[in-house]
């Protein structure tokens, strides 16, 4: 049974779009059927060069669209939506990948899980393969192996205390947690932002959990074809940043992981991707790691820091939501 709307916490759902109206529209269509009334949907457009924005505004007028102005990457784009949600009084922010679809009870189950324990700082879903709807892609998230320098999703139900991170494909964050540790790490462009945030939460005393009744269908990596050297660069730059901050054995974590990933690509004869692994792992980053700031300074980080560009809100019905969304 759904919560009574007058007692439902307010949830802002944040999606990113970048030249992908087809996927975004399928995701938004699934959100119309959520059994949760007190919700607001925000789409942050990360500098699309196609007609995505115009089509989203035309076909989904109940969605608030924010223009980032350029492709800022996943964490920066999400942070724009998260800041807007916090300004609008959100009790929770649900980060949802635009290539995912939600079961009608997905959000209700996540909020129920969150409300059951005030120390939960991140709540995930049971995520299934879009191409094989009965196949589990991740039980909320997964675990990190510091000795091997990698992370792996759990492919079966597992107790919450064994889950190291919640995958960003479906990630519910309470307002109190954001006020405690801040937003996503803007020194990351893509990949590893979800383990980083969960480790930061745990360092600050928060727990993470999985709402098994919250079902999400998400495209697997196989649906996108072969990865590119550019993706390898992003992945390994982000992995190195994570391990240098959170691993008890950072040099081992970084270089064992790099060696294994480079070796795999060399055995495949993919020398461009092998070079990209090295380039990413040795890339310098001038943005301080949030974990480092938290470990050195007990003051809470701001949740309203300026994004890299001034976002533009594109919503003609800024205060008029869908029938399911209320201010």
Regions found by a protein language model. Give the residues of each.
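Acidic/His-rich active-site region of diverse nucleotide-sugar glycosyltransferases
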Residues: 76-80, 100-182, 187
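Catalytic donor-sugar/metal-binding loop of nucleotide-sugar-dependent glycosyltransferases
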Residues: 186-189, 195-217
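Glycine-rich, basic loop-to-helix element that forms the pyrophosphate-binding segment
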Residues: 67-88
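Acidic donor-binding loop at a coil-to-helix junction in glycosyltransferase catalytic cores
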Residues: 166, 190-196, 231
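Non-catalytic, C-terminal membrane-associated alpha-helical segments of glycosyltransferases
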Residues: 229-240, 244-327
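Short, acidic, metal-binding catalytic loop of nucleotide-sugar glycosyltransferases
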Residues: 29-38
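Short beta-strand-to-loop acidic/aromatic patch adjacent to the donor-nucleotide binding site
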Residues: 90-101
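Short beta-strand/loop segment that forms part of the nucleotide-sugar
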Residues: 39-47, 66-68
């Amino acid at each position: 049974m759904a919560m009574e709307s007058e007692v439902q916490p307010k949830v802002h759902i944040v999606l990113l779009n970048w030249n992908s109206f087809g996927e975004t529209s399928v995701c938004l269509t699934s959100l119309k059927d959520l059994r949760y009334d007190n919700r607001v949907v925000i789409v942050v457009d990360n500098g699309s060069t196609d007609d995505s924005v115009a089509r989203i505004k035309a076909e989904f007028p109940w969605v608030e669209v924010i223009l980032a102005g350029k492709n800022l990457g996943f964490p920066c784009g999400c942070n724009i939506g998260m800041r807007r949600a916090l300004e609008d009084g959100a009790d929770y922010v649900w980060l949802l990948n635009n290539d995912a679809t939600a079961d009608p009870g997905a959000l209700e189950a996540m909020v129920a899980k969150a409300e059951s324990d005030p120390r939960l700082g991140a709540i995930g879903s049971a995520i299934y393969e879009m191409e094989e709807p009965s196949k589990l892609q991740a039980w909320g998230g997964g675990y990190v192996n510091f000795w091997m320098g990698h992370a792996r999703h759990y492919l079966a139900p597992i107790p919450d205390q064994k889950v190291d991170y919640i995958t960003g494909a479906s990630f519910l964050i309470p307002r109190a947690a954001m006020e405690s540790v801040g937003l996503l790490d803007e020194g990351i462009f893509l990949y590893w932002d979800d383990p980083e945030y969960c480790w930061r939460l745990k360092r600050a005393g928060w727990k993470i959990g999985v709402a098994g009744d919250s079902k999400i269908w998400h495209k697997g990596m196989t649906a996108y074809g072969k990865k590119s050297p550019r993706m390898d660069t992003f992945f390994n730059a982000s992995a190195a940043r994570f391990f240098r901050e959170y691993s008890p054995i950072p040099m081992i974590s970084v270089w064992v992981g790099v060696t294994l990933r480079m070796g795999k690509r060399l055995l495949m004869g993919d020398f461009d991707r092998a070079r990209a692994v090295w380039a990413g792992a040795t890339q310098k980053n001038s943005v301080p790691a949030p974990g480092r700031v938290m470990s050195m300074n007990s003051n809470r980080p701001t949740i309203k820091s300026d994004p890299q560009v001034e976002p533009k809100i594109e919503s003609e019905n800024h205060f008029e939501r869908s029938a399911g969304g209320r201010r």
